[in-house]
């Protein structure tokens, strides 16, 4: 009996060596079977190095016990202690695989397969495995020989002698040898059938890809042809019998279990189709009936057994069809849909443990790689590998996948596949579910070298790699670049000059010669930059062609690329961020404004990357965030000119952000449809530009005051937005209509205060109009009391006196849009409180005031509409245009604002909605006016985006007019429809205006 002290010492040593049940382990060590070696410390050390020391010890005892006699047991134990390579391999297998331990217990002499380890055995291939299976003459002996070969693969794997790729390749080679052995058994059993047919076995899936798992269905396709002049029908029948027998030999369960199922369901028509077809029958099916996924499956087709010549002919015949698959309608969408369907079919209880099929799993990597291969492999034969890791390496070498992304995907795939191998190796069962039992997780973690805290570390590493796969899979697999590339003719994924010229003509480029020069400048050369450009250009050309001016799009792309081409992140952004390339294409070809803004600061391209639907970087920033940025910049600047230069730079960047968001939302992308709510886009642009203008004025005001007076101006000073500015409805080229109000600080002379206030206004105007690369901001104060004849700045008291005594009805109407925007907020709010009684007069407007407003409106229509302008197409002063709608709404505000709080807003659309809610307009009339106002505003925004300068009517230039149409959602050739729709919508609005405003 073991002394307590000794037991305690052994118990502790076992714990230190990783045993989870030291008591049971101690009993096994004390067993008679291990008596000759139990005192040798190398045994305990070797057991402690295994994935599961308890399991390895139990397996060793069973193996020793199973030896035929004492001599055999002594040979095993002596070799175990003397030969470290055997000790590591044997105990490594026993600690990782209960199934292989069972095999060794049934076949106790098979441990000797792990003794010989000559250098040539480090990487055995099909021939070596065929020799290992050569003596197997029946299904049972084939299984035993197969397991013996599997022992050597598993031993090299768990000891780290081979990596994941080599292990998977060896498993595929063993499968190949096994299929050949099984077919030989079948042919031997039916020599007459063998004599009249040629039968080729084509490996598919992971076996075909030379990347098999320990336990996996072996996917195959059979091709049969007559031999020796035999009848084709009889030959196919004979080949079918041989194929069926071969499948049974591998798949059926015997006293030695099974090897793996042979699955022929990837054949034409699946399980409903004939098991064996002739080559011509295969070709006819794929030419006429095959679905997209069937071509994807053929990526991995590889002849492995039977008539290899026939198999190679099969692969060569079908290969062209594989590389034409990307031309099929909806090819990319079909592949993506199939992947999503696989995920959707995973039981909810299993999805978090699905190592293969779940999000971030192995299939995500495989699908992404295969899709990229099918799209780009048409023009690049280097991508045509059936092995995932080899294909990924080739994709990275060709510039189709970022190098860093490829490294991360490779690492993640290797980890997840190795984890899958360890899970399957334990019981030699086909599974992709990560076990939940701690003992299983501990064994897997230790087998992967995670010894400190195996369970926690395994879960952390697994989730980390799955997260990487999910992120990169979404970038690579779902990036909309592929859809467009997949629709190009073969050979155009990377353009040759001749193909480019033909493509340019077909796409309608007005100057193909100039466009080709741009392409040659962008795509020529052997640099990585040029390779990536060649990949992007076919896609971009198609997107440019969707616009009204593809030549401008390509020219602008060249300008941006010349400016940023040496910047590492630029091409990486376009290639890897799904939204960026298409967003850039839309922006560069939609007109002059956005490209002009971008050319002045090309780094703003970074805003076009992925986010919420590809628009996350384009979401306009709020006023508070903008003011914080500009005020901080002013604080850092050395003087007012430098400060305002920085502020104007921010304004330029944010104008680009808003314009790009507007364009992308108006055009839509491959992933995200065009914004259906046109009013929402109008509100977005108006609010964003108004917030930006307010922040610009705030920063400029701060810079001027700091330069001239330090921290404190002698008078409190506020800027009040008017017109579209006060209504949050500014367009891209709008001036800033404002009023300036000041109030002398205590003890400051009024004249001194007035001089300071006027000096501030003059300096703000000067700084915002200094010629520079940034667009100027014009300040217009003509809506002030007495107009251009009145003082530019007034005190609060002066404003109050004027409005009480002299104010005309049009001035009360103008005040409906007054809103504090910059400067002293308390003073600004007091000004708003001051004017409320004038813009929302108690008891509303009298009849005389209503008649005066109507008279003013009629005179404006008659006098201000430009000579020769079409009144049906003028967005501001034309029939049913902006002025019509706004004056109608404002009349209701003047009449009813005093009793209807909802009408007390500076914004047209909310006021219109409030008038409807108050019963002042019917829902139909309100909708008609809203539709016309939104459309007219959209047209004005479009004109500015297209021409780069403001305009109130549709362009006369045909290409510019078409560009406005594309922005509004009208396709090529539908400019006439756009004008007809505009006239129809505004005509209906004018009818409402006549009734509501003029009382007709």
Swiss-Prot record:
Record field: catalytic activity: [glutamine synthetase]-O(4)-(5'-adenylyl)-L-tyrosine + phosphate = [glutamine synthetase]-L-tyrosine + ADP; [glutamine synthetase]-L-tyrosine + ATP = [glutamine synthetase]-O(4)-(5'-adenylyl)-L-tyrosine + diphosphate
Its Enzyme Commission number? 2.7.7.89, 2.7.7.42
Offer one example of a GO biological process linked to this entry: regulation of glutamine family amino acid metabolic process
Q: Which GO terms describe its molecular function?
A: [glutamate-ammonia-ligase] adenylyltransferase activity; [glutamine synthetase]-adenylyl-L-tyrosine phosphorylase activity; ATP binding; magnesium ion binding
Annotated Gene3D superfamilies: 1.20.120.1510, Beta Polymerase, domain 2, Nucleotidyltransferases domain 2
The annotated region (Adenylyl removase) lies at: 1-481
Keyword ATP-binding: yes or no? yes
Note the SUPFAM superfamilies from the entry.
Nucleotidyltransferase (SSF81301), Nucleotidyltransferase substrate binding subunit/domain (SSF81593)
Keywords assigned by UniProt, alphabetized: ATP-binding, Magnesium, Multifunctional enzyme, Nucleotide-binding, Nucleotidyltransferase, Transferase
Cofactor field:
Mg(2+)
Positions of region (Adenylyl transferase):
487-1000
Q: Which GO terms describe its cellular component?
A: cytosol
Which PANTHER family does UniProt cross-reference here?
BIFUNCTIONAL GLUTAMINE SYNTHETASE ADENYLYLTRANSFERASE_ADENYLYL-REMOVING ENZYME, GLUTAMINE SYNTHETASE ADENYLYLTRANSFERASE
- Family as reported in the entry's similarity comment: Belongs to the GlnE family.
**Purpose:** Involved in the regulation of glutamine synthetase GlnA, a key enzyme in the process to assimilate ammonia. When cellular nitrogen levels are high, the C-terminal adenylyl transferase (AT) inactivates GlnA by covalent transfer of an adenylyl group from ATP to specific tyrosine residue of GlnA, thus reducing its activity. Conversely, when nitrogen levels are low, the N-terminal adenylyl removase (AR) activates GlnA by removing the adenylyl group by phosphorolysis, increasing its activity.
State what protein this is by name.
Answer: Bifunctional glutamine synthetase adenylyltransferase/adenylyl-removing enzyme
Protein species of origin: Streptomyces avermitilis (strain ATCC 31267 / DSM 46492 / JCM 5070 / NBRC 14893 / NCIMB 12804 / NRRL 8165 / MA-4680)
